[in-house]
Amino acid sequence: MSTIRPVFYVSDGTGITAETIGHSLLTQFSGFTFVTERMVFIDDAEKARDASQRILAASQRYRVRPIVVNSCVNPYLSVILAESGALMLDVFAPFIGLLEHELNTSRHSRIGRAHGMVDFETYHRRINAMNFALAHDDGVAASYDEAEVILVAVSRAGKTPTCIYLALHYGIRAANYPLIDEDLNSDQLPLRLRPYRKKLFGLTINPERLQQIRQERRPNSRYAALDTCKREVAAAERMFSAERITTLSTTHTSIEEISSKVLVTLGLQREMF
């Protein structure tokens, strides 16, 4: 069996739902190379037929059955896509019938509801959270009074992408603070962070992985040297331990998992947008 499998994320909207679920599923299987492609706004029969032909062409090119993660709400479009002969993983079909029976009502197909601008208040909260994350990135903010979360870590340990994810998907006002040499000379929290202890969450990372990331940013620099990475990570972990700050390693942890851990640890109840 070929270890290369073409995968298509097909949606009548942006494709975020299909890609998120598909990625979560595929990460459970090692030893394969998944060649992925997004097909978005497939919202009529003509577009569905074109998509089906492209999927069929991929099966001929790779000589293996493609995988389709489908989030189209119109079942007719799903039938057309299935004509490609691909393995169809329908995001909604297994659950719609169960919900219709339980709620004693028929569904109303609404394209893009999962990630669309459902109402202005929700959209406004998301944008404000995003602006907050950018304004409070890398310790540039004068105050953290309005922050709901403050991620603390050495440089390039995953603070910024996690803050942005929390803002976009949960509307969380997330700030981050980079630990610099001056901070790492002590096992105590930096003075700026001490008033916000209950908002802090520490991120750590394998030094070898940190070196790889820093090497891409500043090749062959002292900043990217392995001994620098080891020293900074060890000092940060000593501080987190001494101050009893909950920590999580980002080395083999997805942003989704990190974000979920942060929300649970800090007791933030927020629905995903």
UniProtKB/Swiss-Prot annotation:
Coiled coil: none annotated. ADP binds at residues 153-160. Its EC number is 2.7.11.33, 2.7.4.28. InterPro entries: Kinase-pyrophosphorylase (IPR005177), PSRP (IPR026530). One of its GO terms (molecular function) is ATP binding. Keywords: Kinase, Nucleotide-binding, Serine/threonine-protein kinase, Transferase. Transmembrane segments: none annotated. It catalyses: [pyruvate, water dikinase] + ADP = [pyruvate, water dikinase]-phosphate + AMP + H(+); [pyruvate, water dikinase]-phosphate + phosphate + H(+) = [pyruvate, water dikinase] + diphosphate. Belongs to the pyruvate, phosphate/water dikinase regulatory protein family. PSRP subfamily. PANTHER family: PYRUVATE, PHOSPHATE DIKINASE REGULATORY PROTEIN 1, CHLOROPLASTIC. Bifunctional serine/threonine kinase and phosphorylase involved in the regulation of the phosphoenolpyruvate synthase (PEPS) by catalyzing its phosphorylation/dephosphorylation. HAMAP family: PSRP. This is Putative phosphoenolpyruvate synthase regulatory protein. The lineage of its organism: Bacteria, Pseudomonadati, Pseudomonadota, Gammaproteobacteria, Lysobacterales.
